[in-house]
Amino acid sequence: MPTRSSVLLGLISLFILFACRSAYAAPLATLAVETGRFARVETPVSVSLAGVPDVESGVSLRLEEVKGSQRIGVPAQIEAGNPPRLWWILEGTTPAETTRVFELVKGEPVETTSVKAVKSDEFLDIVVDGKNVLQYNHAVVPAPQNMRNVPPQRRSLYDRSGFIHPLWSPKGSVLTDIHPPDHYHHMGIWMPWTHTRYEGKMVDFWNVGDGTGTVRFAEYLSTTDGPIYGGFQAVQEHVARQTSEGEQVILKEVWDVRVYNVGGPDEGYWLVDFKSTQRCIAPEPLIQEEYRYGGFGFRGAREWKGEDSAYLTSEGKTRADGHATRARWCDNAGKIDNEWEGVTFYSHPENFGHPEPMRLWPEPDNYIFFNFCPSQLGEWEMDPGVDHVFRYRWYVHEGKIVVEGAERIWNDYAYPPQVQIEVNES
């Protein structure tokens, strides 16, 4: 005959069981990820959390994948905003036309390695699991002391802030270059405009040596650490130095850079998203003249030269025939210590002029320089108060590019998985 204590214990156990079932039956939200026409491999996904209860209350939230009777914890990250967004990685390989189901519940989040933004007085490093990915330079980096064909009194025109260098490969090679002797104004990864007009006068934010323009870091809006991505938002100023008002900020620009917690040295790649939002804050428009280069630029490692370097575009173009063509993506690669490494740049489908025309150096014995350049299409204007948004994904990889892999990254970027959310309002 059961004792009073055993009956009480049984009731407590039954209560706990029903409580657990109730919790599983009533998540805060159910999320269905649909891969669509393409297979996915380690793909970042996100969804708006508008209307989801407790998201902004400080309550700990946990993401779980539902696989039959199993619920498997998944690392996730909430991006602040109005509304906030939930980010996670669709782990592993997921076939096309597949749906995976997740639930957002109250509970401790899954712990994993994180992406960190580490700031010093001179620069900010983005680090994944202790490995450097990229460095953003907010302090002014002086030009070299001995510059060929540049008078000493003009050397300071080449001092710069507001650019990325180094960009590291997964195994730690430096893939960018700054102040190279053939083009002292090249600054790793940077985004100035070249042939522009303001108040009817030429302003060159790119070449800088004529003293008419430059770009400089202004301030950080945010830095982010997290299990899914880390990054920063930085304000930059495009400055015309010889206007009727003297030195004047013409464009206010925000860089939003995030590095995802995928790939790494073992998998041989990094994945980076870059967004530039530019607004003319001057009283008159900035006129962009038709020109062969200007905009998002990349100067490759000094080792990448001649036969030890290569371009390949999404349309199959190379160094020999790629300049002034248009493409969805372009791979830039070369040998360092006798091993191939590279970075593929993807132009977002919503970018102005997409698929964007490109500046590639065609000379067979030259270095690697790359530029998405919408100004090749003709003259255009940046009117006061209007935002111009440019988005680019970077696939930083070991080895030569594999077209199938490059296209997979493109599909993730241009046609991301769709996430359907059902909010439990009870």
Where do the PLM segments sit?
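Bacterial N-terminal signal peptides that target proteins for export
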Residues: 1-11
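Bacterial N-terminal signal peptides
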Residues: 9-21
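Alpha-mannosidase-like glycoside hydrolase catalytic domains involved in N-glycan trimming
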Residues: 26-114, 136-235
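Short, well-ordered beta-strand segments enriched in hydrophobic/aromatic residues
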Residues: 29-33, 126-130, 272-280
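Beta-strand-rich recognition/accessory modules
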Residues: 89-94, 345-426
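Acidic, contiguous internal or C-terminal segments within carbohydrate-active enzymes
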Residues: 116-120, 225, 235-290
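Acidic (Asp/Glu-rich), glycine- and aromatic
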Residues: 136-169, 262-310
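Active-site/ligand-binding surface loops and adjacent short beta/alpha elements
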Residues: 286-354
